[in-house]
Amino acid sequence: MNSWTGLSEQAAIKSRQEHGANFLPEKKATPFWLLFLQQFKSLVVILLLLASLLSFVVAIVSGLRSNWNFNHDLIIEWVQPFIILLTVFANSLIGSIQEFKAQKSASALKSLTKSFTRVFRNGELISINVSEVVVGDIIFVDAGDIIPADGKLLQVNNLRCLESFLTGESTPVDKTIDSNEKATILEQTNLVFSGAQVVYGSGVFQVEAVGIKTQVGKIAKTVDDSVTKLSPLQQKLEKIGKWFSWFGLGLFAVVFLVQTALLGFDNFTNNWSIALIGAIALVVAIIPEGLVTFINVIFALSVQKLTKQKAIIKYLSVIETLGSVQIICTDKTGTLTQNQMKVVDHFCFNSTTQTDLARALCLCNNASISKDANKTGDPTEIALLEWKDRSQLDLKTYYRVYEKAFDSIRKLMTVVVQKDNRFIVIVKGAPDVLLPLCNNVQNEVKNIENLLDQSAGQGLRTLAVALKVLYKFDQNDQKQIDELENNLEFLGFVSLQDPPRKESKEAILACKKANITPIMITGDHLKTATVIAKELGILTLDNQAVLGSELDEKKILDYRVFARVTPQQKLAIVSAWKEAGFTVSVTGDGVNDAPALIKSDVGCCMGITGVDIAKDASDLIISDDNFATIVNGIEEGRKTFLTCKRVLLNLFLTSIAGTVVVLLGLFILGQVFKTNLLQQGHDFQVFSPTQLLIINLFVHGFPAVALAVQPVKEKLMVGSFSTKNLFYNRQGFDLIWQSLFLSFLTLLFYSLGIIYAINNRDLQTSGDLINRAGSTCGFFILGASAALNSLNLMVDKPLLMTNPWFFKLVWIGSLASILVFLLIIFINPLGLVFNVLQDLTNHPVLISYSFGGVILYMGMNEVVKLIRLGYGNI
């Protein structure tokens, strides 16, 4: 190595000021308080806050009107706005906590800040932190080092760099100091790039770009500029939430005005507050308050499950998008294969033994494996070391005295090793180059070439080895050096392959059963890619494989294997499938993969081999670099969507039924029972806002969690799975008739409760007690029926014909919700707050009405299922 002066400390400081420091700026994390405030941008939340504010106004007016006599009516009026506020804040807190956790898991550590490199400063070779490297520095690197910045080579000594993270090429690149002006920047062999790994030799280069201005940094900027993707379900929920909000706001105004007019203007101060409370109850009934919260909880539980299965989800929404994936564009090396070259076959010529062949390949080798299994060097040479038990090869008795390094022109590597008084010349390299240099194969060349063709036909890489013995060697004798690679004795060859993972074939088969199309995109050779793709079942026809250089963008959808692909071509492939309307997942581990990872619907980065920028660009990180893990994620995504849909159906059931009950109650039953209630000094109200909040939160809360953790019985990975429609296969029809039937039962038993109270001596003297009697029946029927409806959604068969143990968690969740209602209606202090009749045990008729309504609702569902079962519609 020549002596280089390098920069002075003053020059380094000046360079840093002019060109910047050598690190990639991290994207600033959104603080928790801002995440919390962002939850209040939702129109649903704004409407609930407005309802809370108006409830406060009503409470204040009522307080002024009663001279602040805090009877139980006024207490309830003051409790209601606080409960609405508590609901809003709880929802927002849960949402912000989940986003904050996802944000923390998404922040990848920048490995550059922890690395050191060797640099010439003031004529001395010193070690500095990579972040301190500046433009103009002269850097020395050798095998095992990571290139710290982009630069131009000044000196090389058999330097080979692995740049697959940037170019997609899995073979190390031979570096020179000669430039090629016609080549692209990434193809310039006299340039080195930040993040590349030196696998062989050594070199000296001068830094030309650092930090964000390197090739890595330019791609990193596209990652920082990317936006968070919404899942298909989140997009639908955003629209549904807006629809509910505007519909609720419109009905609020209409109901308030009509109710005020119906109540009359004689006692306007009192009547407008009654109308306002009714309108607020309607808004609370319409809006499914738990919509976002329950979906986030389900997503979070699924994310935790996948984390244990080696899939780290960065954003909650990704889990559901996974379930809708139709195309998986996957790398070959390390994802479908083991990312570890292995000797899978060998040929020993004449009397050569496996031990002889293995010993020669280990001696002509510059890789190393330490006692703690730390591997350094070219992956192919490492595979040769791992082929046989080296302890049996007696390698320590051989001493290397000379090496003629491998280069891409000769395609050979030669070493001279000494044992006792013998000098053994060992030559390793390409079989087609090595065979003509051997003098013992003249009559067997054709047979050997046939064997080599068979290996090539299987997509295997072959390496041949030969040797000769000298009894005198002088490395200063140029004539002897020139003759080293002639008159050799052929020993044989080995065939190497990065073999497929055992689980990859099963995962590909699972994809095809699920109508998911796997696409292989690789920087490797077409023949190698084709063999692996056929073995795994990705490729069925030879004309479905194409080289990147021969790719016609109009025919992208016709191919299943793409070989020798550039990053731009990979991006074009992903874009073509997306433009055709497919949901696309992409795997990658290098900087060059970042644009495609961002473009895809679900970007999957390899956790072991993936670089930080690829991890930043991805939506989930596969910590075991295994294709099967992605397939597991898709299955979990499908289950998550199914669970979310069941929760949404239940939420919409109570929203629709609650809205119908409040509307018809106000305008029909309100007129029917108006006289009875007003004569006893009480306004008409089927449900209070607090009752509706309890139904929308507690009724669905326990079953929602239970649905998330309950194993599904459906075969989710058989056939296509669409997340485009929330309701299909008569689910929309069922939702309508169930909601209307539940509304009818609620209004019916509310009316029966009112009639019972009117005719009961203990209750008929108080309008408040009369209203509470009816409200108690309706409250329990609507809530308990919705809780048990979670079980209806689990199976198409009647519940009486299924084993309860299959859905034990949902049973537990539903019964827990019913227990909440029982506590409310039977514990007097709770009943007072939630507007139900106290001392209910004294009124068994009302208890029978409450349970009777629930039994009728569940019974009707069982009858409908039996009818369908009889007609073969299930």
Swiss-Prot record:
EC number: 7.2.2.-
Presence of the UniProt keyword Nucleus in the record: no
Sites where the protein binds Mg(2+): 589, 593
Chief location: membrane
Membrane topology: Multi-pass membrane protein
Cellular compartment(s): Cell membrane
Tagged with keyword Transport: no
GO-annotated biological processes: monoatomic ion transmembrane transport
Top-rank lineage group of the source organism: Bacteria
Cytoplasmic compartment spans: 1-41, 101-237, 294-644, 709-726, 791-803, 866-874
Chain segments annotated as transmembrane: 42-62, 80-100, 238-257, 276-293, 645-664, 688-708, 727-749, 771-790, 804-826, 845-865
Catalysed reactions listed for this entry: ATP + H2O = ADP + phosphate + H(+)
SMART domains the record matches: Cation_ATPase_N (SM00831)
MF terms (GO), sorted A to Z: ATP binding; ATP hydrolysis activity; metal ion binding; P-type ion transporter activity
Gene Ontology annotations for the cellular component aspect, listed alphabetically: membrane; plasma membrane
Extracellular-side segments: 63-79, 258-275, 665-687, 750-770, 827-844
Keywords in alphabetical order: ATP-binding, Cell membrane, Magnesium, Membrane, Metal-binding, Nucleotide-binding, Phosphoprotein, Translocase, Transmembrane, Transmembrane helix
Active site location: 331 (4-aspartylphosphate intermediate)
Cystine pairs: none
Function: Could mediate calcium influx.
Family label: Belongs to the cation transport ATPase (P-type) (TC 3.A.3) family. Type II subfamily.
Protein name per its UniProtKB record: Probable cation-transporting P-type ATPase
